[in-house]
């Protein structure tokens, strides 16, 4: 018997199963606005959608054109997706004919200098958000910043933690145990993160225009229509073409404990970068970036998973974690699913439930340099050639085929599904669906995109525009109830009023505001 099986056995009674199934989830989906002429939208964030600074469900990410839809936390997957669908529908009805780009990698961008950085008004808070994005532009270029994805927020039931705490025999307080357990989940997730691009990576091909003279070591093949692809790739979004930060490669952020993690993040925020110093911070009276450190602020740290806690007003993410520990985790390794109108589907979320619970309930040893190297090489292999027949990965120094490893994992996942399926078979069905994609890589999301674009000879841009038009029709005809419509209209108005109130209440200059903000940034744990 393994520790995983022991823990499952201890949770197999009715109360344990109910506690295990009491998961809380949230979604964040990014999507570019595109014009009817297939170009990136260059107009401001639509007023009908409210204030991107203060709206709880509709905001912007890097660009005015890059919408971000945020769901409230929910314990029900169907409710979660219904809410996300309603947000999309309301938005499309107020985009004046514009569509949403339904894949992660952008295409018809035009001149990258024209990509509009997100604007949040004239308040110090809003100006800082825009300046941070301006800094990202100088540091990494605008094109990388408009790559979109889906983030999955996940937390366990408050009823489950006392049972796991008692089962562990830990001498830690319950809050300390919760943080320790979430970091155990994170360590296992990082070892197994390659599973997600294999199943859910959906960017094996890109428009030829995306490279625009970029140097790359990737040996792309080209279709007659100009689409670039790697024959067995899964997620070019997660490759060096996508959202990565070479300056961060030297950072040593530890996931061994909350303390070590916070120490690493705080050191990174205060670590000067010679490369970024060359940009300048304030040149000829105009800011180019918040500072010249490796990270301007904590949000710049790129990772496929993050430990999170809801922040109080004015609180930085690390301060919230230091104050009260980990509250939930954020999965950031998901491509937009082009076969779903909202970029993600229920079977993926059920798989993620099982996958993350497996990471939580399995033993999670601390990492070392050899383990970190293995994590990196396995992920890179799956990103570049995950669908390659017989692809071998490394598991604790020993070679193992991706397929054999995945089938072993799915046998363990099935045990969890049997406990989660209290009234039905939704989890078993989701696992059965994705197990078929282990047996046949053509059934992965990247396999389906490859079939549509490469095997059928369709230009990548045409393929995506066809989906964009289809989903536009779907959302424009989606029936929003009068109450839901009124709710969105009310929040649009109240968010604009809230932004105006913030702007009116500012009393210090922007220079003073920034000085005060960074004065409060500790470079080490006390």
UniProtKB/Swiss-Prot annotation:
Pfam families attached to this UniProt entry: Glu_cys_ligase
Pathway: Sulfur metabolism; glutathione biosynthesis; glutathione from L-cysteine and L-glutamate: step 1/2
Entry GO terms, CC: cytosol
Annotated signal peptide: none
Class of the enzyme per the UniProt entry, highest EC level: ligase
Catalysed conversion reaction: L-cysteine + L-glutamate + ATP = gamma-L-glutamyl-L-cysteine + ADP + phosphate + H(+)
GO biological process: glutathione biosynthetic process
Gene Ontology MF annotations: ATP binding; glutamate-cysteine ligase activity; metal ion binding
Keywords: ATP-binding, Glutathione biosynthesis, Ligase, Nucleotide-binding
EC number, as in UniProt: 6.3.2.2
Record family assignment: Belongs to the glutamate--cysteine ligase type 1 family. Type 1 subfamily.
Record's protein name: Glutamate--cysteine ligase
Gene: gshA
């Amino acid at each position: 018997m393994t520790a995983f099986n022991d823990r499952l056995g201890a949770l197999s009674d009715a109360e344990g199963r109910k506690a295990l199934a009491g998961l809380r989830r949230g979604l964040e989906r990014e999507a570019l606005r595109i014009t009817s002429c297939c170009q990136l939208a260059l107009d401001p964030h639509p007023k009908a959608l409210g204030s991107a600074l203060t709206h709880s469900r509709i905001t912007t990410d890097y660009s005015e054109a890059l919408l971000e839809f945020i769901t409230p936390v929910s314990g029900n997957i169907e409710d979660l997706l219904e809410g996300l669908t309603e947000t999309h529908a309301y938005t499309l009805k107020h985009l004046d004919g514009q569509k949403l780009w339904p894949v992660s990698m952008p295409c018809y961008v035009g001149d990258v200098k024209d990509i509009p950085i997100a604007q949040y008004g004239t308040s110090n808070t809003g100006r800082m958000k825009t300046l941070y994005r301006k800094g990202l532009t100088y540091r990494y270029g605008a094109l990388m910043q408009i790559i979109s994805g889906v983030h999955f927020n996940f937390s366990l039931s408050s009823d489950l933690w006392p049972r796991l705490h008692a089962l562990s025999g830990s001498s830690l307080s319950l809050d300390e145990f919760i943080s320790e357990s979430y970091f155990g989940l994170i360590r296992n997730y990082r070892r197994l993160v390659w599973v997600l691009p294999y199943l859910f990576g959906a960017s094996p091909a890109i428009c030829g225009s995306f490279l625009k003279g970029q140097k790359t070591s990737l040996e792309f093949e080209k279709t007659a229509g100009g689409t670039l692809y790697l024959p067995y790739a899964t997620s070019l979004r997660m490759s060096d073409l996508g959202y990565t930060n070479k300056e961060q490669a030297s950072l040593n952020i530890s996931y061994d404990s909350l303390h070590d993690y916070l120490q690493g993040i705080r050191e990174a925020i205060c670590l000067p970068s010679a490369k970024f110093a060359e940009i300048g911070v304030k040149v000829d009276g105009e800011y180019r970036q918040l500072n010249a450190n490796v990270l301007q602020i904590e949000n710049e740290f790129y990772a496929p998973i993050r430990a999170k806690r809801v922040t109080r007003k004015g609180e930085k993410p690390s301060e919230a974690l230091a104050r009260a520990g980990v509250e939930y985790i954020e999965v950031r390794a998901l491509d937009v699913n082009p076969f779903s109108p909202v970029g993600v589907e229920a079977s993926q979320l059920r798989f993620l439930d099982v996958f993350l619970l497996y990471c939580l309930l399995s033993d999670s040893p601390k990492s070392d340099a050899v383990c970190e190297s293995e994590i990196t090489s396995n992920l890179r292999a799956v990103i570049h050639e995950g669908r390659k027949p017989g692809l071998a990965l490394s598991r604790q120094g020993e070679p193992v085929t991706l397929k054999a490893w995945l089938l072993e994992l799915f046998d363990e996942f099935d045990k969890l599904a049997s406990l989660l399926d209290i009234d039905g078979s939704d989890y078993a069905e989701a696992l059965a669906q994705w197990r078929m994609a282990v047996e046949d890589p053509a059934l992965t999301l990247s396999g389906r995109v490859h079939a549509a674009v490469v095997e059928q000879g369709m230009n990548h841009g045409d393929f995506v525009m066809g989906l964009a038009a289809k989903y536009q029709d779907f959302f424009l005809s989606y029936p929003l109830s009068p109450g839901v419509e009124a709710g969105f209209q009310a929040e649009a108005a109240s968010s604009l009023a809230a932004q105006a109130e913030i702007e009116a209440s500012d009393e210090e200059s922007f220079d003073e505001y920034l000085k005060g903000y960074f004065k409060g940034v500790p470079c080490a744990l006390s």
